[in-house]
Amino acid sequence: MRRSCLMIRRRKRMFTAVTLLVLLVMGTSVCPVKAEGAARQMEALNRGLVAVKTDGGIFVSWRFLGTENASVLFNVYRDGQKLNAAPVKTTNYVDKNGSAGSTYTVRAVVNGTEQPASEKASVWAQPYHSVPLDKPAGGTTPKGESYTYSANDASVGDVDGDGQYELILKWDPSNSKDNSQDGYTGDVLIDAYKLDGTKLWRINLGKNIRAGAHYTQFMVYDLDGDGKAEVAMKTADGTKDGTGKVIGNANADYRNEQGRVLSGPEYLTVFQGSTGKELVTANFEPARGNVSDWGDSYGNRVDRFLAGIAYLDGQRPSLIMTRGYYAKTMLVAYNFRDGKLSKLWTLDSSKSGNEAFAGQGNHNLSIADVDGDGKDEIIFGSMAVDHDGKGMYSTGLGHGDALHTGDLDPGRPGLEVFQVHEDKNAKYGLSFRDAATGKILWGVYAGKDVGRGMAADIDPRYPGQEVWANGSLYSAKGVKIGSGVPSSTNFGIWWDGDLLREQLDSNRIDKWDYQNGVSKNMLTASGAAANNGTKATPTLQADLLGDWREEVVWRTEDSSALRIYTTTIPTEHRLYTLMHDPVYRLGIAWQNIAYNQPPHTSFFLGDGMAEQPKPNMYTP
């Protein structure tokens, strides 16, 4: 009953507002039901067919699309020969007689009628696919310090409209800096690659964009609804687009002696995803203004950026750009339509009445419809911003490094947020709250900075997702579980055949043995490397190919290639591709920002889950 309904909640500031609730009464229980909203624009994906050689034959896997009915079945073909006697319901198949030279297709069967064949898939020789990269040459700073490049965070979008994802990759110089550190950095480079390694373009953000996790937040999404993804990010004088055109003054250099850029114009540019061509450039907002307004005068807190994609009207995507979270905080929303950028709203914590929204942001954000109106809200650390740019609530618990938003507790209506907090004087070092109202459902005092926290269903003995932080594991109700915790507090990934989530850290995937309280290794990707130092995050984690399980993208140790790893473990569970889930897809868009976090779904995906709701979507 829980997952077939969603409570339409009042915001805290709207005590007198009239809220329409459709009430379903069963015995003594009352379940508020969300009215059906408008369909959302989503990507027109192909089958994502993948075939991988295993010891038991060829493992074949494909997408179940959000546009398809639950009754659809499939036929699997090898070299034009149908393999299954009767149509199969699963979205994976093991061909025991396949060979390395085989080619596979699948055909949907709708009401007994076979549909056209999918794209063809050749067999991978190993459980990963290599995407060769054009590694850039290093350089030298104005102080004579040399640097090299390594592949860093990535995102995905269908930039050419063929139904297959392309990879958008950030190159990080070896001298990239945290905002707290002085020093010059190399230029930030952004590349686009097809999965066969074809490089589509390279954007050089130039000397006036500093390199580091908090500076460049790149959004890859079909913003204008033409069926092809754009790329949006902060730019500056000297940025060179994918066609070689320079934005602004090519000779300008605003770096000070500390290598920081605290003066000069700032721009927001939308680039064509297929070519890297500049489509439109506007003045960047939130604007810098006075550096000292943001919490210090040397340029640390002024340049703390985040970004995201949100369906503010419930139907089409908008761009969110943010600045600041330790003190002054600003969020600005834009639409990119018909070749033009238009600003929708600004939330500024320095404005009268917004004081509660200062100093509450994280190094990450989440985006979801938390109040049931069909329109997305921005979960900005310890606060939330409504689709219209007005603050919904602030818990006052302040900044933190990790944040998880989803249906963490299926035993109660709506979505929840699990967050850790940095302030040692905060009432809670880790908190579990109602995503719509900010009500703290439970929390644990820490008395110190709790730097990491994770949420995933890893123990079927307890309903909902478990959460762990500060050396302890808890149920969704706040009950402490045992004395051990998983081997990592980083990412979670759906990898094996059950509905529980595995742990992803560095170049490893582990599974929590809940009965014995230890983690067991499932995969160690030899020759692959994680990113971002001690954060040890993947280049990307997402449901990129095949069935609903997730792929992980790591760089090779020398950054000569990216490797897309996929599971080869059969599963009886069939779910719509996670990339057609509204919360999950937006989680992939924001995954590259600042301190990367794993995506979550709009519904509870775990042991004992109810039937997954069919995505309410359309494709351009």
Swiss-Prot record:
* Record region (Disordered): 133-152
Kindly list the positions annotated as binding Ca(2+) 2. Answer: 158, 160, 162, 164, 166
Q: Which metal ions or organic cofactors does this protein require, according to UniProt?
A: Ca(2+); Mn(2+)
Family from the record: Belongs to the polysaccharide lyase 11 family.
Q: What does the protein in this record do?
A: Pectinolytic enzyme that degrades type I rhamnogalacturonan from plant cell walls and releases oligosaccharide products. Degrades rhamnogalacturonan, polygalacturonic acid, pectic acid and pectin.
- Which residues are noted in the entry as Ca(2+) 5-binding? 369, 371, 373, 375, 377
Q: Which positions does UniProt annotate for Ca(2+) 1 binding? A: 153, 592, 594, 596
This one is known as Rhamnogalacturonan endolyase YesW
Q: What is its EC number?
A: 4.2.2.23
Q: Which cellular compartments is it found in?
A: Secreted
**Residue positions binding Ca(2+) 7:** 407, 409, 412, 414, 416
Q: What is the lineage of its organism?
A: Bacteria, Bacillati, Bacillota, Bacilli, Bacillales
From the UniProt annotation, give the residues forming the signal peptide: 1-37
Q: How does activity depend on temperature?
A: Optimum temperature is 60 degrees Celsius.
Provide the effect of residue 363 to A. Strongly reduced catalytic activity
User: Gene name on record?
Assistant: yesW
Q: Which UniProt keywords apply?
A: Calcium, Cell wall biogenesis/degradation, Lyase, Metal-binding, Secreted, Signal
Provide the residue positions that the database annotates as binding Ca(2+) 4. 363, 399, 401, 422
Keyword GTP-binding listed? no
Residues at which Ca(2+) 9 binds: 496, 498, 500, 502
Supply the source organism for this entry.
Bacillus subtilis (strain 168)
Q: Name one GO biological process term.
A: cell wall organization
Domain characteristics, as noted in the entry: Rhamnose is bound near the active site, but there are also additional rhamnose-binding sites far away from the active site, which possibly function as a carbohydrate-binding region.
Give an example GO cellular component term for this record.
Answer: extracellular region
Q: What induces it?
A: Up-regulated by growth on type I rhamnogalacturonan.
